[in-house]
């Protein structure tokens, strides 16, 4: 079956939400998702001291890394916490603007510390697992079988299986009882 991916953008006037943005740092890297990427130029032209970062995809923060030396903080524009957590590993303050809910906040040091502890726990689970499942998405810009195969080669002393799928949910993963840790 052929799958057609059609980019979809949020139809939302983002300018009223930008009025909520209060950032003390002077140079702010603006990062967003595919749903808001068409408004990135508008956002940056209306935010003093902003540096256009681009799109974040999953936990891939390459667009953020490219502007790291030019900024003092990040402003993530989008929904949810998945993408902002990925930005926290770059050791700059991370602010979040959810234009849909018209909410603005900074991720606190306490929240970051809690996230890092959870992350360490996941790394420990990986270290102790005998069997690892590597998840590869078939979605455009996410499919990277070459990286998965390289990862499998580099993981020593463990059985490594590669799982390829379009959509993944925890319920599906529970069907594979022998996997001690999942890597995405």
Regions picked out by a protein language model, each given a short descriptive name:
Residues 1-114, 118:
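The feature marks the mature, well-folded catalytic cores of soluble enzymes
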Residues 25, 70-72, 91, 129, ...:
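Short, well-ordered alpha-helix to beta-strand connector turns
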Residues 26-51, 135-162:
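Short, charged N-terminal beta->alpha structural module
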Residues 30-31, 74-77, 161-165, 181-184:
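Short, hydrophobic beta-strand segments that form beta-sheet elements in well-ordered domains
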Residues 54-70, 107-113, 145, 154, ...:
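Glycine-rich, anion-gripping cofactor-binding loops and their flanking helix/strand elements
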Residues 83-160, 167-173:
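Redox- and metal-dependent alpha/beta enzyme cores, enriched for Fe-S-associated oxidoreductases
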């Amino acid at each position: 079956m052929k799958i057609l991916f059609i980019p979809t953008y949020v139809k939302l006037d983002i300018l009223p939400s930008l009025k909520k943005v209060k950032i003390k740092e002077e140079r702010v890297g603006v990062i967003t998702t595919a749903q808001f990427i068409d408004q990135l130029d508008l956002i940056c032209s209306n935010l003093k001291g902003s540096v256009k970062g681009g799109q974040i995809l999953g936990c891939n923060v390459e667009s953020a890394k490219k502007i790291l030396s030019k900024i003092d903080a990040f402003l993530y524009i989008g929904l949810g916490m998945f993408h902002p957590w990925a930005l926290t590993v770059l050791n700059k303050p991370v602010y979040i603007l959810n234009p849909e809910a018209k909410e603005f906040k900074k991720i606190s040091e306490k929240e970051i510390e809690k996230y890092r502890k959870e992350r360490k726990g996941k790394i420990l689970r990986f270290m102790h697992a005998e069997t690892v499942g590597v998840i590869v998405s078939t979605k455009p810009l996410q499919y990277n079988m070459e990286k998965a195969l390289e990862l499998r080669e580099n993981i020593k002393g463990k059985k490594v299986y590669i799982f390829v799928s379009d959509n993944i949910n925890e319920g599906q993963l529970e069907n594979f009882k022998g996997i001690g840790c999942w890597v995405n």
